[in-house]
């Protein structure tokens, strides 16, 4: 579930307004889960960079800035509490390398992809070759 502060927070310093979609937290959580599956092991800082963008600095040139690390960290904690992701450590167990997908998380992503495959093939006819 989305935290109570999710209705008022911006998704990064590069944004001027908070999100307008009512379900943006759940869409972001699904995107984070997919990114962990594709890019893992990945941490909260690198995840925030994935959701960053150009900051408007007025007359000066735009610069790339990270998204909100609190949002990324909170979503990673929620996914971890649901046993969809776990922390990966080095062989000695002393360094946390980031989050990786569990078997439960992978099966959830596979089920979701299988559920929308039919409608995706109807919308994009050439998709069946992949």
Label every model-predicted segment:
Residues 1-30, 34:
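Long, low-complexity, charged/polar intrinsically disordered regions in eukaryotic proteins
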Residues 31-39, 50:
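Short amphipathic alpha-helical elements of helix-turn-helix/winged-helix folds
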Residues 41-63:
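Short acidic, hydrophobic short linear motifs in intrinsically disordered regions
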Residues 47, 72-82:
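Basic amphipathic alpha-helical segments that dock to polyanions
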Residues 60-67, 73:
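Conserved, aromatic- and glycine-enriched, well-ordered alpha/beta core segments
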Residues 80-92:
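A short, conserved structural fragment
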Residues 94-130:
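Short, amphipathic alpha-helical interaction segments positioned at domain boundaries
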């Amino acid at each position: 579930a989305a935290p109570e502060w999710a209705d008022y927070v911006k998704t990064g310093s590069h944004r001027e307004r908070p999100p307008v979609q009512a379900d943006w937290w759940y869409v972001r959580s699904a995107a984070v889960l997919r990114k962990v599956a594709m890019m893992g092991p990945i941490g909260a800082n690198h995840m925030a960079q994935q959701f960053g963008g150009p900051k408007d600095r007025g007359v000066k040139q735009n610069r790339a800035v990270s998204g909100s690390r609190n949002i990324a960290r909170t979503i990673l904690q929620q996914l971890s509490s649901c046993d969809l992701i776990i922390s990966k450590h080095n062989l000695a167990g002393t360094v946390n390398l980031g989050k990786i997908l569990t078997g439960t998380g992978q099966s959830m992503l596979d089920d979701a992809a299988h559920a929308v495959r039919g409608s995706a093939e109807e919308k994009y006819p050439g998709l069946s070759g992949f």
